[in-house]
């Protein structure tokens, strides 16, 4: 349907170019192809080099971390990030996301809690909190207009991942937050902030994009891009997607 509708909206354009530009103004396949090729050229050798080294120990991230304690951590993180909790709410879902209801005055973020891994929710909240900070930073006179809530999804994701990775996984922030983690989860008291910093920055291939580390995250996006491009050009049928997904991930 997406490919067909392009025939009426912009018949002179490639269907995927049309929808890329609708999603991110001015974005083209040529730009994506060049960008991902450069990224792949550097990420794949880097990942091989990492895998050849002794692996970091992230056992401290796994254990039993009660959901109610993780919820307290979420509240602490949101307040620490400077979110106005009078206008930003938190709920639980399977897949974390952020949305506005009507305007940036009513912002909703979600997370999920895994009782065997508190870091999953911790970084989801920081990530979604980055989205919410960008949304709630919109000018009040733009509320309830199409300009409310940010310039583009590309900028939006840059803000969320800036908070999640450049700040949230930094040595400075992990050192700051570690005493609170030990307060909520006493079993961490036998570890150090430096051990926590190293554990949350462990790089290894995974199947879930939202759980991916900073090195391998972009590989998940590349797979989705290649599949979507082929579907839009009629080179891959939707019912064949699961098998092709499995092949590319292997």
Summary of predicted features, one role per range:
Residues 54-60, 107-115, 139-146, 207-212, ...:
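Glycine- and acidic
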Residues 98-106, 132-139, 194-202:
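Active-site-adjacent bridging/hinge elements
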Residues 10, 111-115, 120-140, 157-164:
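Active-site recognition of the HExxH zinc-binding catalytic motif
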Residues 1-118:
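Contiguous, non-catalytic segments that form substrate-binding/exosite surfaces or channel walls
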Residues 26, 49-60, 139-146, 167-178, ...:
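Inter-helical turn/loop segments and adjacent helix faces that build the functional surface
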Residues 172-250:
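Long, amphipathic alpha-helical stalk/connector segments used for oligomerization, subunit docking
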Residues 35, 66, 101, 105, ...:
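Secondary-structure capping and boundary motifs in well-ordered enzyme cores
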Residues 149-189:
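Post-HExxH zinc-binding segment in Zn-dependent metallohydrolases
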């Amino acid at each position: 349907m997406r490919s067909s509708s392009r025939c009426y909206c912009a018949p002179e354009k490639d269907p995927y170019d049309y929808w890329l530009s609708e999603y991110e103004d001015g974005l083209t396949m040529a730009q994506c192809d060049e960008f991902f090729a450069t990224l792949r050229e550097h990420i794949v050798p880097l990942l091989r080099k990492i895998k050849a080294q002794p692996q970091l120990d992230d056992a401290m991230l796994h254990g039993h971390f009660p959901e109610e304690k993780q919820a307290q951590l979420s509240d602490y993180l949101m307040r620490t990030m400077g979110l106005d909790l009078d206008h930003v709410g938190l709920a639980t879902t399977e897949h974390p996301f952020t949305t506005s209801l009507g305007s940036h005055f009513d912002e909703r973020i979600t997370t999920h809690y895994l009782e065997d891994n508190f870091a999953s929710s911790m970084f989801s909240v920081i990530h979604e909190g980055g989205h919410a900070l960008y949304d709630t930073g919109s000018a009040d006179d733009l509320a309830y207009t199409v300009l409310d809530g940010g310039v583009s999804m590309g900028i939006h994701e840059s803000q969320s991942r800036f908070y999640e990775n450049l700040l949230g996984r930094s040595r400075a922030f992990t050192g700051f937050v570690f005493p609170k983690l030990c307060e909520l989860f006493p079993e961490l008291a036998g570890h150090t902030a430096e051990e926590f910093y190293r554990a949350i920055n462990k790089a290894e291939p995974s199947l879930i994009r939202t759980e991916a580390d900073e090195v391998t995250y972009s590989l998940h996006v590349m797979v989705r891009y290649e599949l979507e491009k082929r579907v839009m050009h009629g080179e891959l049928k939707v019912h064949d997607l699961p098998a092709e997904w499995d092949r590319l991930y292997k």
